[in-house]
């Protein structure tokens, strides 16, 4: 029964794009024990994957802005102890950044990652015991799947399963069909204009499609409220 540690800390889209690789691992290595290191704000997403035994949260984003605090170094020391508390057969860093490679370096196990030409930050490859070439032009989902397959020794099959267990109920009444508008981003410069969301929502509403706008933080709630003034929009509760 192989023990596998996945290192993919952020951001939300990258974390979701890594889920099919984890499903592949579970399918090809039945009984494998899979743990996943992820940024604390995305831990709940990883916990939805049916094949992940343990979610190990980190706070790299918070730590970077507080390196002068003793509490930061205390948390880093606790993370290292946790990662070294049990051995892994494979440590797979599918992020390809120096920060993720350093996290993998803390763990006990054979460290796998992208080679210098494939990694997003070439220097990260120095921290791996085994380096794998994966074409950079592929979609992130396919790159993650190919890396895992190369590290664990199986062939990638067509198609992919995200393996996420979704809740069967929503906090509001939903009619079918519906569209889910994910309006939030990690940075303001990545936001799509609110007027564009309203325009798209109006076009979908004209076709009988209900638009749902989930939100988390207060500023996201306000943004969704402004967008939802267009016909056919509904705001769901916080996520």
Region spans (language model):
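Catalytic machinery of carbohydrate-active enzymes
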Residues: 1-239
């Amino acid at each position: 029964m192989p023990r596998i540690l996945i290192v993919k800390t952020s951001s939300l889209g990258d974390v979701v794009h890594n889920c099919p690789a984890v499903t592949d691992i579970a399918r090809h290595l039945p009984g494998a024990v899979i743990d996943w290191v992820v940024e604390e704000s995305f831990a709940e997403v990883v916990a939805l994957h049916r094949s992940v035994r343990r979610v190990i949260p980190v706070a790299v984003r918070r730590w970077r802005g507080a390196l002068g605090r003793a509490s930061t170094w205390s948390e880093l020391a606790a993370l290292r102890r946790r990662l070294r508390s049990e051995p892994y057969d494979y440590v797979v860093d599918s992020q390809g950044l120096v920060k993720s490679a350093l996290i993998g370096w803390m763990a006990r196990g054979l460290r796998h990652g992208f080679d210098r030409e494939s990694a997003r930050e070439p220097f990260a490859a120095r921290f791996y015991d085994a380096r794998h070439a994966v074409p950079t032009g592929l979609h992130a989902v396919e790159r993650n799947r190919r890396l895992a397959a190369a590290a664990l020794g199986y062939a990638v099959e067509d198609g992919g399963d995200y393996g996420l267990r979704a809740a069967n109920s929503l906090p509001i009444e939903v009619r079918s069909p519906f569209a889910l508008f994910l309006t939030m981003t990690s940075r303001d410069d990545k936001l799509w204009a609110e007027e564009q969301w309203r325009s798209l929502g109006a076009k979908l509403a004209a076709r009988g499609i209900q638009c749902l706008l989930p939100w988390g933080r207060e500023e996201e709630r306000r943004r969704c409220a402004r967008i939802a003034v267009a016909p056919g929009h509904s705001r769901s509760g916080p996520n």
